[in-house]
Curated annotation (Swiss-Prot):
Subunit architecture: Monomer. Component of a complex that contains two dimers of PRK, two tetramers of GAPDH and CP12. CP12 associates with GAPDH, causing its conformation to change. This GAPDH/CP12 complex binds PRK to form a half-complex (one unit). This unit probably dimerizes due partially to interactions between the enzymes of each unit.
Induction, as annotated: Insensitive to light/darkness. Slightly repressed by heat. Induced by anaerobic treatment.
Keyword Plastid: yes
Organism of derivation: Arabidopsis thaliana
Gene Ontology MF term list: copper ion binding; nickel cation binding
PANTHER family referenced in this protein's UniProt entry, alphabetically: CALVIN CYCLE PROTEIN CP12-2, CHLOROPLASTIC, CALVIN CYCLE PROTEIN CP12-3, CHLOROPLASTIC
Family: Belongs to the CP12 family.
UniProt-annotated stretches for the region Disordered: 1-21
Disulfide bonds, paired cysteine numbers: C78-C87, C120-C129
Source taxon at top rank: Eukaryota
Name of the encoding gene: CP12-3
Protein name per UniProt: Calvin cycle protein CP12-3, chloroplastic
Length: 134
């Protein structure tokens, strides 16, 4: 039985080929091939909710850590007086960081593209986004 091997951490699939094995990038989806009849393959799609890019994963982890820190700060500030202005500001900060993390998750699900592409759409004049034609 021939089957494609996949590495889930990078979202890549190696196609079952005798001559060459090329990785195929699939984003957050992992494709697997399974031999049903000799030389005929059926395609199965397995979804996985992991970030495709290391920087995106690190950003989400940092936002999660910030939320935990802000919650601790807010509970400390609100211990003395729950109705104070400082208490409201502290919980507003928690809400803002939580919203930033939620926005990142929504953006990842909707766009599911290279972060450089969205950056270049917003900043086409930067050096990272220049396109050279031969």
């Amino acid at each position: 039985m021939i089957s494609g091997s996949a590495t889930a951490s990078h979202g890549r699939v190696l196609l079952p080929s005798q001559r060459e094995r090329r990785p195929v990038s699939t984003g957050s989806n992992i494709l697997r091939f399974r031999e049903t009849v000799p030389r005929q393959f059926s395609l199965m799609m397995v979804t996985k909710a992991t970030a495709k890019y290391m920087g995106t994963k690190m950003r989400e982890e940092k936002l999660s850590e910030m939320i935990e820190e802000k919650v601790k700060e807010a509970t400390e500030v609100c211990e003395a007086e729950e109705m104070s202005e400082e208490c409201r500001v502290a919980w507003d900060e928690v809400e803002e960081v939580s919203q930033a993390r939620a926005d990142l998750r929504i953006k990842l699900k909707l766009l599911n593209q290279d972060p450089l592409e969205s950056f270049c759409q917003e900043n086409p004049e930067t050096d990272e986004c220049r396109i050279y034609e031969d």
